[in-house]
């Protein structure tokens, strides 16, 4: 919402962004661009040398009409994005360049608008919980690029609550994650005129559930997906919400939460990725 409002205000006619082949962010960007009559250019990096299969989010990107560039592993996607933007300008277009997740400033993004969206999400949830006479002790989410986690942290500070925001990393180490999240949170607070700043010490991230790496399915994640589906009828994905739920369950089993704590799990989407992992997921279910 906020990012595309900025793109419309800047009279952009093509949005350029990047992520992995099964990026939820890129798929949502393509959908929003289609709704607003803009073109979308997605720079999607392969994780390895496996064949590219049009399923999951990649299939939806095609259906949504995105122009897709598949990049080799290790490619600097930001540099490619700027090159593509220059090519679009030379053709008379007005490109809007936004990094993965939409919360790191740079390109066309002057403020961390993606994180602002999740600040608003925190305040919305806070109001809903208050109407039920509840206040969360913890809010648990998957974290990758960090914008969602940063936005929720600022939201908790803005609402002056004691809610602790817990990120379950789906990619990097906790140490590597905390400082960028704190930077995004501080930028978000500054952009909104909030007299507060954040350090790495204010960020809670657990990295024990990453497994072998980003997008690599493991048994605890598959178990969490199956349990939540069969107990609650809610679908989690293998990349983000499945790993985060596996982390939440393990933390609960280890006594991280008190028995009477109110714990909110934020489902960040990603369901289309299930179909990319179909056979692998079923093989874990059979074990």
Where are these regions (language model features)?
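Short glycine/serine/threonine-rich phosphate/pyrophosphate-binding segments
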Residues: 1, 22-29, 35, 145-152, ...
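Active-site-adjacent helical/loop segments in soluble small-molecule enzymes
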Residues: 199-259
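Glycine-rich phosphate/pyrophosphate-binding loop at beta-loop-alpha junctions
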Residues: 115-204, 266-287
């Amino acid at each position: 919402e906020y990012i595309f409002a900025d793109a419309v205000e800047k009279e952009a006619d093509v949005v350029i962004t990047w992520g992995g082949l099964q990026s939820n962010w890129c798929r949502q960007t393509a959908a929003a661009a289609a709704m607003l009559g803009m073109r979308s250019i997605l720079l999607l990096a392969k994780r390895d040398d496996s064949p590219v299969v049009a399923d999951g989010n990649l299939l939806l990107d095609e259906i949504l009409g995105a122009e897709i560039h598949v990049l080799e592993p290790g490619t600097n996607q930001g540099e490619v994005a700027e090159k593509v933007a220059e090519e679009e300008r030379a053709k008379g277009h007005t490109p809007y360049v936004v990094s993965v997740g939409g919360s790191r400033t740079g390109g066309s993004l002057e403020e961390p608008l993606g994180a602002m969206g999740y600040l608003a999400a925190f305040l919305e949830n806070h109001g809903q919980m208050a109407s039920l006479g509840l206040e969360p002790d913890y809010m648990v989410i998957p974290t990758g690029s960090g914008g969602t986690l940063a936005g929720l942290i600022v939201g908790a500070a803005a609402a002056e609550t004691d809610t602790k925001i817990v990120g379950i990393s789906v990619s990097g180490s906790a140490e590597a994650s905390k400082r960028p999240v704190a930077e995004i949170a501080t930028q978000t607070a500054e952009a909104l005129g909030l007299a507060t700043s954040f350090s790495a010490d204010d960020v809670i991230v657990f990295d024990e559930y990453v497994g072998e790496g980003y997008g690599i399915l493991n048994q605890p994640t598959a178990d969490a997906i199956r349990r939540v589906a069969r107990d609650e009828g809610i679908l989690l994905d293998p990349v983000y919400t499945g790993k985060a739920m596996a982390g939440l369950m393990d933390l609960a089993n280890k006594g991280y939460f008190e028995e009477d704590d109110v714990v909110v799990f934020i489902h960040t989407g990603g369901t289309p990725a299930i179909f990319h992992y179909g056979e692998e997921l079923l093989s874990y279910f059979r074990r």
